[in-house]
Amino acid sequence: MHKYQTHWVEHSIVKILSSTGKKHIALMAGGMSAEREVSLVSSEGVSKALIELGYRVTFIDMGADIAVRLQEIKPDIVFNCLHGTYGEDGCLPGLLNIMRIPYTHSGVLSSALAFDKIHSRIWFLTNNINMAEGIVVNKSDNIKNDPMKRPYVIKPLTQGSSIGVEVIFAEDDFNFADYDFPYGDQVIIEQYIKGRELQVAVLNGKALGALEIKLLKNRFYDYETKYTEGFADHLCPAPLPANLYEKLLIESEKIYKTMNCKGPARAEFILEEQTNKLYALEINTHPGMMPLSIVPEIAAYAGINFTNLIEEIIKTASFES
């Protein structure tokens, strides 16, 4: 397992990408989370689309001085292309609400809920969204044996991109007593559901479509598989019976709306092989915008090219009063 670190950066890096345009967009990317590199790659395509759309664009690699830099730059809108801590967890939306700067993507509460796996799990179950059996394990519990019958999944509470996720199978040489809790003092342990990996893109409350992930090399949809070409195939649209496909879209819209999301989101599910039962995994309020990313791919299938997708996201920019 790789260990991806959060990096504390004092000063933001600011670059003017386009000095003229109809509105001034601050494209926020990079930042201090373990998903920094994913965010930077996502921002490359977004910046090109924003310039193509005729916006004045300033790129900001976010540091701890971000409030001061925003006061200096005075953008009309912030395009939140951050992933992980400080950008995806509700921190940046909170700051932008105070500064009264409109921003893309979800607000404080929906971002924080979706990012924290304990609280999102409680929210899902409260709203009758089916999930795999799961428990919270604290480092202080000093558990020596498997906390659940194998196979099971270990998930850090607040990491995206499957960073830190491990699947423990019956044959694995793994002793839970040796697990070092690399991403905080709590983890979620969930029953591993063998089945088909399904992803749904939602934009402004409407599900655009679903695709299936077919693993080619690794045993589960981990960080390496998500961001390495040739490790998985995307089947778009997902080859499902019409009634099941429709149910998937309806469930995704339900999650999006009950969590009061804004702009783009990606809902993730497992379809159990033996029972055809859907299990929700999570909703991601800051889906990737890379060449291999799922939301742009599904949007293209729905007739929305990448540039138009970015324009639709910009249209939702607002702050919470």
From Swiss-Prot:
It catalyses: 2 D-alanine + ATP = D-alanyl-D-alanine + ADP + phosphate + H(+). Its EC number is 6.3.2.4. Mg(2+) 1 binds at residues 268, 282. One of its GO terms (molecular function) is ATP binding. Mg(2+) 2 binds at residues 282, 284. It is found in: Cytoplasm. Binds 2 magnesium or manganese ions per subunit. Pathway: Cell wall biogenesis; peptidoglycan biosynthesis. InterPro entries: ATP-grasp, ATP_grasp_subdomain_1, D-Ala_lig_Van_CS, D_ala_D_ala, Dala_Dala_lig_C, Dala_Dala_lig_N, PreATP-grasp_dom_sf. ATP binds at residues 147-199. Its cofactor is Mg(2+); Mn(2+). Keywords: ATP-binding, Cell shape, Cell wall biogenesis/degradation, Cytoplasm, Ligase, Magnesium, Manganese, Metal-binding, Nucleotide-binding, Peptidoglycan synthesis. Pfam families: Dala_Dala_lig_C (PF07478), Dala_Dala_lig_N (PF01820). Cell wall formation. This is D-alanine--D-alanine ligase. The gene is ddl.
